[in-house]
Regions:
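Conserved active-site motif detector
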Residues: 1-162
Length: 162
């Protein structure tokens, strides 16, 4: 399944990914949760979230910053792992001229921001895309954190979910 225009590549050498459903518990805050692991479609090999294959095409897996300030909005079903996300640049942001807000695809709920150090790197790319990959929930089942795949348009294709 392809999501929106962001996943239709016009580049010959787009990185093709498989999203593999999974969950972890007891591994520590950075990993505990549920969502999708990444695999390279051509080799079938698993990719780490900091894998060089991702960075070669300008893609990064990020932990969305500022989610603790938006706990009510994080409950929006648009943030479920596997859903496309909208990235909205905020050049007039008083804290960071490179700020990139992370919204659900309908732009009705904001989860937070791309971390400032990553937003600075992505500033050179004209069009950006994102896909929700991983979520953390508290003991009551409320979503409290989100990890996303962020990439320049046309560099990544996600052909199927497992």
């Amino acid at each position: 399944m392809l999501f929106g225009g962001c996943l239709r590549s016009s580049l010959m050498e787009a990185l093709r990914l498989i999203l593999e459903r999974g969950s972890l518990s007891g591994a520590g805050d950075e990993l505990d949760g549920r969502g999708f692991f990444l695999r390279a479609a051509e080799s079938g090999e698993p990719l780490r979230w900091q894998d060089p294959l991702l960075s070669e095409v300008g893609a990064q897996v990020i932990r969305v910053a500022g989610t603790s300030y938006r706990s009510a909005e994080l409950g929006d079903p648009g943030f479920e792992p596997g859903n496309p996300l909208a990235l909205v640049r905020e050049p007039d942001n008083p804290h960071d001229a490179n700020a990139i807000a992370v919204w659900n695809d309908e732009r009705t709920a904001q989860a937070g921001y791309v971390p400032a150090n990553v937003a600075a790197v992505l500033a050179g790319f004209e069009e950006l895309c994102a896909l929700s990959l991983w979520e953390w929930r508290d003991s009551t089942g409320d979503r409290i954190g989100l990890r996303a795949l962020v990439y320049p348009e046309g560099t990544v294709r996600v052909p199927r979910l497992r």
